[in-house]
UniProtKB/Swiss-Prot annotation:
The keyword Calcium does not apply. GO terms for molecular function: RNA binding; structural constituent of ribosome. Keywords: Ribonucleoprotein, Ribosomal protein. The gene is rpsI. NCBIfam families: PRK00132.1. This is Small ribosomal subunit protein uS9. The lineage of its organism: Bacteria, Bacillati, Bacillota, Bacillota incertae sedis, Caldicellulosiruptorales. One of its GO terms (biological process) is translation. InterPro entries: Ribosomal_Su5_D2-typ_SF, Ribosomal_uS9, Ribosomal_uS9_bac/plastid, Ribosomal_uS9_CS, Ribsml_uS5_D2-typ_fold_subgr. Belongs to the universal ribosomal protein uS9 family. PANTHER family: RIBOSOMAL PROTEIN S9 (PTHR21569), SMALL RIBOSOMAL SUBUNIT PROTEIN US9M (PTHR21569:SF1). GO terms for cellular component: cytosolic small ribosomal subunit.
Amino acid sequence: MAQIRYYATGRRKTSVAKVWLSPGNGKIIVNDKNMEEYFPLETLRIIVKQPLTLTETLNKYDVIAKVKGGGLSGQAGALRHGIARALVLADPTLRPVLKKAGFLTRDPRMVERKKYGLKKARRAPQFSKR
């Protein structure tokens, strides 16, 4: 018998997470590594687990994810977005809770481009009066 798997994608900054959610006991595997191995900081692990802890489904589903692009913070955010979307596919009654927490909304903030004549996006070169 084939196991039910729910697929969703999450995005944040330049990171894209492909998430497969299946009934299980709470294992989270990111890029073929354990989540504790992949995300060295506890804060990043908390971000990834947020949708599951909020909906009290932490030990009900296994998460397998492939993450590409960006840094660890962006990848954690993309993973959170993907897990939240997959949870809604698995159980549509969780949608209002996740929506209220803002986990279903794609964070539109991106890195601002560098402009010519400036050192960074907004940082101007030092001004000398004399």
